[in-house]
Amino acid sequence: MIVTETIIRFENVTKQFDNDPPVLDNVSFEIEKGKFYTLLGPSGCGKTTILRLIAGFLEASEGQIYLGDKVINQIPANKRPVNTVFQDYALFPHLNVYENVAFGLRIKKLKKEAIDKKVQEALRFVNLKGYEKREISEMSGGQRQRVAIARAIVNEPEVILLDEPLSALDLKLRTEMQYELRDLQKRLGITFIFVTHDQEEALAMSDEIFVLNKGEIQQSGTPIDIYDEPINKFVADFIGESNIVNGKMIQDFEVEFVERRFECVDQGFRPNEVVEVVIRPEDLEITSAEKGKLQVTVDWMLFRGVHYEVGCIDIDGNEWLVHTTRKVRVDDKIGLAFEPEAIHVMRLGETEEEFDKRLDSYDEVQ
């Protein structure tokens, strides 16, 4: 049995500025030690507010924030075992790489030998050994990020907070840094909490993801869980691309949408309950019209490099997005095939707690 240790806990935390609507509204969650977490959501959803509350840059309006078993609401930022890597890295331009990394240690008045040992070790961890005397202005974007991370880990924090640190990098470098950050977190064994609005970053890097919207956590779980089993339309639409249509759950393992009934793997709904149905674009296969479960007309097509993105319309006017390596032409009449496992049925207004209980009931039956 694997024993996990909770390092950070939010208990009914609300953050409100003046009389404005809450930025965070009664949020509760736990962060386990040694994992890579991502707070994911659109602008204004509350993800950066959570980061600042953990760091001590903001104070909660209501609720308790725990570090281990200790409430830290009133503990100032400089007394928390937490370091933040900011979006702009916040490096000192007048100091070289070595002095940037050593800055926090000098504030603590460590001996010169101890500072040198810690700085060299931090630079080795981020693959910047030999760059000690380099000026910050001479560093690339990726190298500056490594300096910022070295400055964070040199203080041996229990938690590292990363506030959209990849957003200023180009696509190729951003992808490279995703791998580097994930590898670094595994080697260090420190808890990372990463903020982003980029779902691909979240899926690629995280052990656990919290999806936020309008100050509330919509869903939490592993990348695979959230992608394959979204709890509601917002999560399904925000995490990857989705085809979402209205439907009706006829009975266990049978759902109706686009005026046809299909076998599915979902259960635990009321007979004839109104639901929403999700099918991912990559789970749709283009076939001849007569072999398809759905008959559609090709409306448009884009080449995306590794696949074609095909937009289709069925006889009722529903739009369907397909990812395929098969080339078709606009106005072609085609069929769309899919397996029962490709259909995901969502209950309207279901909470995450109710959703988890329903999934547990699946496991018990199986």
From Swiss-Prot:
Pfam family for this entry, one: ABC_tran
Membrane topology term: Peripheral membrane protein
Signal peptide residue numbers: none
Gene Ontology molecular-function annotations: ABC-type putrescine transporter activity; ATP binding; ATP hydrolysis activity
Any one GO cellular component localisation term in the record: ATP-binding cassette (ABC) transporter complex
CDD domains: ABC_PotA_N (cd03300)
Enzymatic reactions: ATP + H2O + polyamine-[polyamine-binding protein]Side 1 = ADP + phosphate + polyamineSide 2 + [polyamine-binding protein]Side 1
Ranges of residues in domain ABC transporter: 8-239
Keyword line: ATP-binding, Cell membrane, Membrane, Nucleotide-binding, Translocase, Transport
InterPro entries (UniProt xref): AAA+_ATPase, ABC_SmlMolc_Importer, ABC_transporter-like_ATP-bd, ABC_transporter-like_CS, Mo/tungstate-bd_C_term_dom, P-loop_NTPase, PotA_ATP-bd, Transp-assoc_OB_typ2
Superkingdom of origin organism: Bacteria
Compartment(s) where it occurs, according to its Swiss-Prot or TrEMBL record: Cell membrane
Residues engaged in binding ATP: G41, P42, S43, G44, C45, G46, K47, T48
E.C. numbers: 7.6.2.11
Gene3D superfamilies: 2.40.50.100, P-loop containing nucleotide triphosphate hydrolases
Function text: Part of the ABC transporter complex PotABCD involved in spermidine/putrescine import. Responsible for energy coupling to the transport system.
Family: Belongs to the ABC transporter superfamily. Spermidine/putrescine importer (TC 3.A.1.11.1) family.
Name the UniProt record assigns to this protein: Spermidine/putrescine import ATP-binding protein PotA
